[in-house]
């Protein structure tokens, strides 16, 4: 018994030395786990001799001694093989080589530099879970150790095992566990990955001409006369009178005078839209002088639809939001228009609502 006490004292003294050393060399971590194996063997031998205490320490049960010894042996052998690979010269701390991290998903792999991945289930900010994506993953093959990067997509968190994706977190299973399993959003490194199961259409879908923006539902149809931009003073011709009477209504007096038509153009500078809110043209009598502040969101159609759905949680921060639309050109990008009562409300919206980096926002002013 005295011999076992002396051996245990010497072993634990060296273990404490490695704790204080806080080395980042793999060789030191291998020596540390060799001492842990030795400590487990001493405790197992003491239990076989029916010893309940040794050096004022309670001797674990035989089952516990075996389990800890197997863990130490497994990790010690894995570190020795890693030492013989090209990654043996990298920095390895005691935290990087602990057994708890070794058996954390992905299991039986060494991992470094974890980043947090937050998943929001069912668009409920109160129903979130955090997961770890490892920047570096070291896994063992028949040819030796390999190093790869951890990745994340809408399905889960994975690493590339050869040419195959090895998922170690399945967001679908997590969504069934913590929510309805129908929808979830992945937030990682300032980006948002939307669940494609919620977005039914694809980016190639054609937008129907019947899909019009809510804020523009009451606007009158523009004629070619209102879209042209003459730059000179001209005499209003007689045929123009009947056309203007139809636009202005039967009771509106008609005058044939020399008028200067203002330039009504939409200028785009530094992602800010400016337009003239007033007009002296009598032919535009049906246009309202109401001016609203707007934000155009431009990007992938599916992302815009999912983003627009999340706007329901922030109804007090905007006035109206349009459906997804696009210009009549060969482009897959869609546009969503949001209107605001004031510039302050718009600023509050942009501060509160997270806009993904894949979506570009353009500020502007529009007359209704």
UniProtKB/Swiss-Prot annotation:
GO terms for molecular function: DNA binding; DNA-binding transcription factor activity; nucleotide binding. GO terms for cellular component: host cell nucleus. It is found in: Host nucleus. There is a cross-link at residue 298 (Glycyl lysine isopeptide (Lys-Gly) (interchain with G-Cter in SUMO)). Gene3D superfamilies: 3.30.70.330, E2 (early) protein, N terminal domain, subdomain 1, Papillomavirus E2 early protein domain. Residues 211-226, 272-283 have a biased composition (Polar residues). Residues 1-200 are annotated as: Transactivation domain. The keyword Amino-acid biosynthesis does not apply. Residues 252-263 have a biased composition (Low complexity). It comes from the Viruses. Keywords: Activator, DNA replication, DNA-binding, Early protein, Host nucleus, Isopeptide bond, Phosphoprotein, Repressor, Transcription, Transcription regulation, Ubl conjugation. The keyword Transcription regulation applies. Phosphorylated. Sumoylation plays a regulatory role in E2 transcriptional activity. Residues 211-283 are annotated as: Disordered. Its main location: host cell. GO terms for biological process: DNA replication; DNA-templated transcription; regulation of DNA replication; viral DNA genome replication. Residues 291-368 are annotated as: DNA-binding domain. Plays a role in the initiation of viral DNA replication. A dimer of E2 interacts with a dimer of E1 in order to improve specificity of E1 DNA binding activity. Once the complex recognizes and binds DNA at specific sites, the E2 dimer is removed from DNA. E2 also regulates viral transcription through binding to the E2RE response element (5'-ACCNNNNNNGGT-3') present in multiple copies in the regulatory regions of the viral genome. Activates or represses transcription depending on E2RE's position with regards to proximal promoter elements including the TATA-box. Belongs to the papillomaviridae E2 protein family. Binds DNA as homodimer. Interacts with protein E1; this interaction greatly increases E1 DNA-binding activity. Interacts with protein L1; this interaction enhances E2-dependent replication and transcription activation. Interacts with protein L2; this interaction inhibits E2 transcriptional activity but not DNA replication function E2. Interacts with protein E7; this interaction inhibits E7 oncogenic activity. Interacts with host TAF1; this interaction modulates E2-dependent transcriptional regulation. Interacts with host BRD4; this interaction mediates E2 transcriptional activation function. This is Regulatory protein E2. It comes from Human papillomavirus 69. The gene is E2.
